[in-house]
């Protein structure tokens, strides 16, 4: 019985991992879109609210994605192994770090690159997971894309 529940949790974490990865990719894609028909030609979706909305639209309804509340607010630095302290403590929730041009304090739209990192905390339903120290499984998805411009 526990083996079946553990297998179900493994399938669930795989499912949510794929959903979070797709959300990061779609959010970055949203921020890179260039509309040549706009007057003047520009990227009308290159802001934090639109990028976050794109990420939220790609995850299941039981997943909560928000912008982080503390520093760093947009760009994560260092190796991903050092980001452990930035994961949300609430189960089945994630923080979306949206980094325009590698600048944590940038207020305007990205001109070169957009990086979207999603740090997601998955909570297994199997009580056996707590025995092996997996009360929360941390899932990371990261995507960097080049901002489109008029050639």
Residue ranges and their predicted role:
Residues 17, 25-151:
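Short, conserved structural patches
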Residues 1-12:
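N-terminal single-pass transmembrane signal-anchor helix
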Residues 12-22:
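Alpha-helical transmembrane segments
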């Amino acid at each position: 019985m526990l083996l079946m529940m553990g297998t179900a949790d493994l399938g669930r974490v795989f499912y949510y991992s794929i959903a979070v990865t797709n959300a990061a990719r779609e959010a970055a894609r949203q921020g890179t879109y260039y509309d040549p028909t706009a007057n003047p030609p520009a990227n009308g979706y290159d802001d934090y609210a639109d990028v976050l909305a794109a990420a939220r639209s790609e995850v299941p309804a039981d997943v909560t994605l928000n912008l982080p509340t503390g520093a760093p607010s947009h760009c994560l630095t260092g190796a991903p192994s050092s980001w452990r302290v930035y994961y949300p403590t609430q189960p089945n929730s994630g923080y979306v770090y949206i980094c325009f041009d590698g600048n944590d304090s940038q207020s305007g739209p990205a001109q070169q690159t957009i990086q979207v990192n999603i740090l997601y905390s998955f909570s297994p339903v199997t009580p056996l997971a707590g025995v092996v120290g997996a009360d929360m499984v941390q899932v990371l998805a990261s995507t960097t894309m080049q901002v489109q411009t008029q050639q």
